[in-house]
C-alpha cells in the first residue's frame, strides 16, 4: 500500500508545488502590515524579542507559565541571527569606511569637503547597521513564517493526493484509470483552494500559534496511517505521532483532531486480532510522546529557567476554571455560523457538497475505515466540542484547515466532473471568486488597522523618547517587536490582566462577573480614571501633596481617535500637549474604543509649572 501511494505522480511536481506556495506566501507576508489580534505579537514575537535582546515586556501568560516556548523560540533564533548578521555587517562596513576615510584624507587633505565626507563615512556603519537590524527584526520573522506556512500548505496538498490514491476503486480498472488521471486535477484544486483561501491569505503568515498548530497538524495528517494499520511499522507513522504530539503540547485542544482516527485504527487492529501491531502502535505512541515531551520540557525550562509544564497549566486555566470567560463569551453556534464561513471562504459550496455526498466509490469492510468518514466525523466532533467552550474565536478552528481543504478539493472534483460540464459559461465566472477572495484579504492585510503597526515604526525612528504611554485598550499595538528601543526610560500602557487570584476560589464564577481590569475601569468612566491615576497635566504644583499616581504624563502619548473625541481633546487643550502625528487605522471597527485614527500627542518642553502661579 505504501508503494501504491507513491507510484502515480501528478503533472505538477512536488518541488514545483512547494516553490509556488513559497513565492506566494513570501509576498503575502511582506505585504501584510496590519493588526489583527494581540496574540500575533504578544504570544510569539514579544517573548522571543525579550529573550533575544534582553528587554521588552511579557504578558501574564508568560509570567504564569501557560504557554509553551517552542513556537516563540523559532523567532528568538531568527532575532539572534539578525543580531549576529548586523554585528558582522557593522565590522565589515567599519573596516571599509575606515579605509575609505583614511584614503580620502591622505589623497585630498586640503579640502574641507574631504574631511566632511570622511566623517560621514565613519558614521555610515552605525546608521546602516541600525537600520539593517531594525528591518531584520520586522521582516525576518515574516519570511520565516512564510516558509513555515509553505511547508504546511505543501503537506496539505500531499495529504489530499495521498487520500485520493488510497481511496481508488481497485475493482474497476476502467474507473481506476479515470480516477488516476484525475490526480493532477485534484492537486490543482487543492493548490488553488489553499493559495486563494481568504483566511489563509489573511492569517497564515501571521505569527499566531494557531498557524503553527495547523502546520504541524498538516504534516502529521499526511504521515498518518490511513490504511487501518498496514503502515504502522513504517517510519512515516512515527513522524505523524511526533508532529501530532508537538501540536498537542503547543495547544492541548489539538488532541481532538486525533480522537476519531486513533479510535478507528485501534478498532480495526482489535477487530482483526492483530495484537502485535497494536503493541507496536502503543509502543510508538509512548516513545514518541516521551521524546516530544522531553524536548518540549527542555525548551520550556530554557525560557522559564525552571521546570515548568505549560500543558497542564493551560488545561487548568481554560478547562477547570471559569477564567477563560474573562476574554469574552460567544453563543454556542458561533463556530458553525461565523468561524466556519470565515475560515472556508469561497470554498463553502465545494465543502458543503463534499460534506454531504460520498467522495469515494471504493467500498470499505467497515465504515469507520473510510478516511473520508473519519475526516467528516473529526470535523463535526471538533466543532461540537469547541462550541461548548465559552470563549470562541475564528482562529481556534484554523488547525482544521487541512481537513476543510481535503473535503473541499474532493467536493470540487466531483462538481467539476458531474455538473460543471453543463455550465461551461458559469464555470469561467466562478474562477473569478478565488481571486476576489485574495483581493479582499490583501486589502485587510495592507489597509484595515494599519495604524497600529505604522505608529510603532514611526516611534522607532524618533530621535529621543524619554517617556511613552498608551491610553487605549490593552495590547492594541505590538510592543518591542516593532518599537525595538531599549532607551525609553518610562514606557507604559493600560493593562488587562485576568483575575488570577481567583484560581482555586470556589466563588470564582460569581466574583468574575464583577471583576474589572484597568482597561475596564478606564472606559467605564474616562474622566474619573484620568483624575484618579494621572496628575494634573498643567502644573506640577497642583498635585495633591503626598499622593502617588499610577501613571505620569509622558512626552509621547498615543491614543485612538475615540479617546480623543470622548475626553482628551478638551482635557489637554490648555496643556503643553500638541497633536504630533496621526495615522489612519480603520474606517470602522467592531470595538468602538479602537475606532478612527491613531494619534500621537507630544508634550512640549515648555511647562506651565515654570511660571509662578501669581503670574498666570
Swiss-Prot record:
One of its GO terms (cellular component) is endoplasmic reticulum membrane. GO terms for biological process: GPI anchor biosynthetic process. Changing residue 48 to T: In gpi10-1; accumulate M2, an abnormal GPI-anchor intermediate due to the absence of third mannose. Disulfide bonds: none annotated. The keyword Glycoprotein does not apply. Residues 38-86, 158-188, 262-278, 360-392, 445-616 are lumenal. It is an enzyme of class 2 (transferase). Its main location: endoplasmic reticulum. The keyword Transferase applies. InterPro entries: GPI_mannosylTrfase (IPR005599). Keywords: Endoplasmic reticulum, Glycosyltransferase, GPI-anchor biosynthesis, Membrane, Transferase, Transmembrane, Transmembrane helix. It is found in: Endoplasmic reticulum membrane. It is a multi-pass membrane protein. Pathway: Glycolipid biosynthesis; glycosylphosphatidylinositol-anchor biosynthesis. The chain crosses the membrane at residues 17-37, 87-107, 137-157, 189-209, 241-261, 279-299, 339-359, 393-413, 424-444. It holds the Pfam family Glyco_transf_22. Residues 1-16, 108-136, 210-240, 300-338, 414-423 are cytoplasmic. Mannosyltransferase involved in glycosylphosphatidylinositol-anchor biosynthesis. Transfers the third mannose to Man2-GlcN-acyl-PI during GPI precursor assembly. Belongs to the glycosyltransferase 22 family. PIGB subfamily. This is GPI mannosyltransferase 3. It comes from Saccharomyces cerevisiae (strain ATCC 204508 / S288c) (Baker's yeast).
